[in-house]
Structure formats: C-alpha cells, structure tokens
Regions:
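Catalytic metal-binding/acid-base residues of hydrolase active sites
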Residues: 11-13, 45-46, 79-81, 107, ...
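Conserved beta-sheet core of the metallophosphoesterase superfamily
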Residues: 95-98, 193-267
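Accessory, non-catalytic peripheral segments of nucleic-acid enzymes
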Residues: 266-436
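Conserved catalytic scaffold of divalent metal-dependent phosphoesterases
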Residues: 90-209
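Binuclear metal-dependent phosphoesterase catalytic core
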Residues: 108-132, 240-314
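Divalent metal-coordination and catalytic microenvironments
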Residues: 9, 24, 39, 44, ...
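Extreme N-terminal starter segment of soluble prokaryotic enzymes
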Residues: 1-5
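Core catalytic region of metal-dependent phosphoesterases/phosphodiesterases
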Residues: 16-116, 213, 217-221, 229
Length: 436
C-alpha cells in the first residue's frame, strides 16, 4: 500500500493568487501532516503564461519546493492555454530533497525505492524496472492541432479518442506485470471523460472528448488520477478507481461541491481515497426572474449568513424597467460580503414581424402577408407598389397632380334667431342642451 496526494487545476495567476495560494498552501500542509509517499499535480498548475518575476510564480514554486522537501513530486502538462509548453521546466530545477518530475510527453515513470524517478525511453517500459514502489502511466494534454493536421480537422476529435484508447490498452500488459510483483499501478492524465459533470452541473456528453471510463479502465491501472474538470467525481470498477480531484479553489460563481485534494491509498488490486476540503471561498447566488426584491435579499442575507462571502445577484427584466433597480440599496444590504456582483439581464423590446413574410418570394406577396397579419387593406398599397415598379417618378407625380379633387360641402351655420329660440325652449325644459 502506498499513500499519495493528488492535486489538480490549481490555476496560479495574478487574478487568482489570493484564492489558490491560500487553498494550495493549506492542502500542502495537510498532505504533509497526514503522511504521503508521493504527490501528483494532474495539470493546470498555472492559469496562463506567467513572467518568471510574477508573484504567482514565486508562490507556486514555494509550495512545490515544500512538497519536494517531503516527498517525490510528479507534475503533468495540462491544457496548453493554461500551461504553455515549457512552463513547468523550471520546477525540475528547484533542488528539493526529492526530485520533481515533469511529465510533458507520453511515458511511464517508475517511483523507485530511494524516492527517485525513472522515466521510460519511449511511451512505455518494455520491462518493469527493478526496485519500483509504484508505476505511473502518464498521458499529458494531447495537442489536437497536431492531430488535426495529420488526419483533418473534421476527423481530429474522433481520431484522438481512438488513438488514446489504443494507447491506454497498450499500458495494460506492463501494468499487469507490475501488479503481479506487488507494485501499485497509477495512471495520470488531463482531459475530459465522456459523461462527466462540470463544476456547474453540466454533463459533458459530446463526441469530441478524449476519454471514456472504459478506455481508462483498459489501461489496467489500479488508480487513475485525472485533471481538467473542476468538479470532484469518481468511477469504480472491481476495486479500481478513476477520479477527478477537482480544482483546489473556487474560481467562479456557481461552482458546485467542495473544493480540495484527494488523499489516495493504493494497493495492487484496489484503491481508495478521501477528499480533503480546502478553505475555498464561499459563493452565494441570489437569482430573480424579474425585478430584484429587496425584502427577499434581506431575508437571504440573514438566513445564509453573507459575512465574508462572495455574493452575486442576478435578475431578468424588461428594457423599460431597467432603471427601477436600486443597486445602491442592494449593495448596502449586502455590505458585509467580501464581494457583491450585480448582473442584470435586460430583455430588449422586440417588434414582431408579420408571420411568414420572410418566406414570400415577391414584394407584392410580402405586402399581402403583412396586410393580412395587421388586418389592413392591402389594395391601396399594392396599387402604389405597382406604380413604383412600372412608372417613372415623373409619371407618378403627374398622376397625383391630375387627380380630381373631391368637393366637400360645408355645413351651413345656424341663424342667430334659431339659436335664440332653441335657448328659450331649453330654459322651459330646465334641462341642459348642447348647442352647436
């Protein structure tokens, strides 16, 4: 039985430094206190390319060195946009008590009895090295652009999945030999498993993902440590386990579940792990379908306890009501939160077009469709349209000028004598009469 700590998706950067350094420092302390034989970081140690003088680089290096002073460390190449190729090379040079091995190619790595690493010359060992404590099969991020250039962009996703499945099956024989010799076998990779869940609860059910649980189990490793997906989740088969550690901290609003690292115990035929939570920041979402209700916000603030939390208020409302939201009052109610983020979604005013008008071929047919939808008379418009299509501007102007003017008869005024008579009759009736 061998014990190891599995960290993943740390994402050190300037913007994330406070959150991830607090969580990773805590995780390193916990791993050392609990006693581990090795540490694995399964990709995305950084969030993007970093300058060597950046505080995030110093903070990450400090914690990696602390780990290396306690046990051997394996760092896997993650997503290229987060860890550009070569980013991890500097960690090979930290010079701790134990070496840091950077797995940036397809390979197998043996953890020897003295706490050193021995990497295979090619993608796998032909014969298991002597004196192993554990055998790691490493599958770093695959460069999809290289695959697309070789097989075509439309076939790249399927080709990657097929080739990785063949590769993983290729590890099975050497892993079986190692298990028979009482050696723990461990897989480490960075990618997406078909059917896994994102940190926001969305299933990844597309056909362009690198792995399936079947292909990962086919490698014959007792434990398979994964990175890339920020939600902790696992699959089990006959005592063997596949698991995402999830991200070390909470980097976005709406992320579900605890954040932490996995503490593994791995034997030859079975494995187990515990999720050790880190002090990730607490996020709260307050969502309204319409106008934000200040009373509901106050109630939520009292019931959930917003002190020190990161609070996001979201609402959806018509465009004409957008100025009715009292943002300052919302911020005042939530003033004990560490951060308040207000996100209003405005529904724009939509003017409906006549149904089916875009499907008509001619302008005349479009006019008829519009007239039918609006219950208007279409004949005058069609007559004008015909004139525009068949006559010159001069002819149209001439027709307008020569049109006969319909004579209108003016209403004759009522003589003054008749008005006086009507007034006298009204007085006699003692009822008001409207004069015109």
């Amino acid at each position: 039985m061998i014990r190891g700590a599995h960290f993943s998706d740390i994402h050190y950067a300037g913007a994330t430094l406070t959150e991830v350094d607090r969580c990773f420092t805590f995780a390193v302390n916990e791993a050392i206190d609990r006693g581990i034989d090795f540490a694995v970081i399964s990709g995305d140690s950084t969030d993007h390319a970093l300058d060597v003088h950046a505080p995030a680089v110093e903070a990450l290096a400090r914690n990696i060195r602390r780990l290396a002073d306690y046990c051997p460390v394996l760092m896997l190449q993650g997503t290229f946009s987060h860890e550009p190729p070569g980013t991890l090379n500097v960690f090979r040079l930290l010079g701790g008590r134990y070496p840091v091995h950077v797995a940036d190619r397809l390979e197998q790595v043996a953890l020897l009895q003295g706490g050193t690493w021995q990497a295979s010359a090619s993608w796998r060992f032909d014969d298991a090295p002597q004196g192993m404590r554990a055998l790691f099969s490493c599958v770093p991020t695959v460069n999809k652009a290289t695959v697309a250039a070789a097989v075509g962009a439309t076939e790249a996703a399927q080709a990657i999945g097929e080739q990785l499945s063949i590769l993983l099956r290729g590890f099975a024989s050497i892993n079986e030999t190692a298990r028979k010799n009482g050696i723990a076998t461990i897989g480490v990779s960075h990618g997406t498993v078909h059917g896994c869940m994102t940190e926001h609860g969305v299933p990844m059910a597309g056909f362009d993902h690198e792995f399936t649980t079947a292909s990962l189990f086919s490698a014959g490793a007792t434990a398979f440590m994964l990175g890339h997906i920020h939600k902790h989740q696992a699959w089990q088969q006959n005592g063997r386990l596949i698991a995402y550690a999830g991200s070390i901290g909470r980097l976005h609003y709406g992320e579900q579940g605890d954040k932490g690292f996995l503490l593994w115990e791995i034997g030859t035929d079975a494995a187990r792990f515990d999720l050790v939570p880190t002090p990730a920041k607490r996020t709260i979402d307050i969502i309204f379908d319409g106008m934000p209700d200040l009373d509901d916000i106050r109630k939520c603030a009292q019931e959930t306890g917003i002190d020190g939390a990161f609070v996001r208020v979201r609402w959806t409302m018509p465009e004409e009501d957008r100025h009715e939201v009292d943002r300052k009052e919302i911020e005042r109610i939530l003033n004990t939160a560490a951060e308040v983020k207000l996100e209003g979604r405005v529904i724009p005013v939509v003017r409906t077009r006549a149904a089916g008008i875009s499907q008509e071929a001619s302008i005349a047919a479009k006019v008829q469709a519009w007239a039918k939808a609006t219950e208007a008379k279409g004949e005058p418009l069609l007559a004008c349209l015909e004139a525009l299509q068949q006559k010159t501007p001069e002819e149209i102007a001439s027709d307008i000028l020569t049109r006969p003017i319909v004579a209108q008869t003016a209403m004759h005024a009522v003589p003054d004598t008749e008005c006086a008579a009507i007034a006298e009759e009204a007085k006699a009736l003692e009822e008001p009469v409207e004069l015109f």
